[in-house]
């Protein structure tokens, strides 16, 4: 928990007013959790570990910084529901990729926890998104301009989301070019929620691609 809290405070000190963390990748001692560790109903030991990490971060950043939990679809709907119910008292902004991205599973996690569900980096077209919207299975979409068909298609997806009162956080963890494209799109839609700024964007090999620092 102390490591998570320290890194969270560092991000806030750099000026970020929202942070996103995967609390279920690293084991307390060393190494990473494997897929089987995060599937099905979780043990009390894992639940206590997860809550301790979330609690430490919330206490470190205070009540006015948005906290997003990210699961990368490593958990399934059952374990995600357990985790969401456990930590929703810490004012979670939204729950990203809590399970394999299907409308039915996303709706299950949302209904069980009451948390806003974010999904989209593995959803690619209007025809896939529409089923999420119809079932109220997603509250924040995360289409990637580089994988969903470009600026025109992503704009259509965002406009469709607006009809269903669904917000947008463009998935942006690629090159400076994809970051710039995401920012241009976000300025042109009414349902923009938050801009994602990945640590990869600050890597020297990415910054060297740019004439101007960003």
Where are these regions (language model features)?
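Metal-dependent enolase-superfamily TIM-barrel catalytic cores that perform enediolate-based chemistry
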Residues: 2-103, 107-108
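Shared catalytic-loop signature of beta/alpha-barrel
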Residues: 85, 91-94, 100-214
């Amino acid at each position: 928990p102390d490591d998570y809290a320290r890194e969270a405070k560092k991000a806030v000190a750099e000026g970020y007013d929202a942070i996103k963390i995967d609390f279920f990748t690293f084991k307390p001692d060393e190494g990473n959790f494997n897929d089987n560790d995060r599937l099905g109903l979780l043990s009390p030991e894992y639940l206590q570990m997860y809550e301790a990490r979330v609690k430490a971060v919330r206490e470190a950043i205070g009540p006015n910084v948005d906290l997003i939990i990210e699961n990368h679809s490593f958990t399934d709907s059952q374990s995600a529901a357990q985790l969401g119910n456990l930590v929703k008292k810490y004012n979670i902004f939204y729950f990203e990729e809590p399970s394999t991205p299907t409308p039915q599973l996303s709706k299950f996690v949302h209904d069980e926890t009451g948390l806003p569900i974010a999904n989209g980096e593995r959803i690619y077209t209007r025809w896939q998104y529409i089923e999420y919207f119809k079932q109220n299975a997603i509250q924040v979409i995360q289409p990637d301009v580089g994988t969903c068909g470009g600026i025109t298609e992503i704009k259509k997806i965002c406009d469709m989301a607006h009809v269903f009162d669904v917000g947008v956080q463009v998935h942006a963890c690629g090159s400076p070019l994809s970051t710039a494209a995401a920012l241009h799109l976000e300025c042109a839609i009414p349902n923009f929620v938050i801009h994602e700024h990945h640590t990869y964007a600050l890597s020297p090999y990415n910054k060297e691609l740019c004439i101007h620092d960003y």
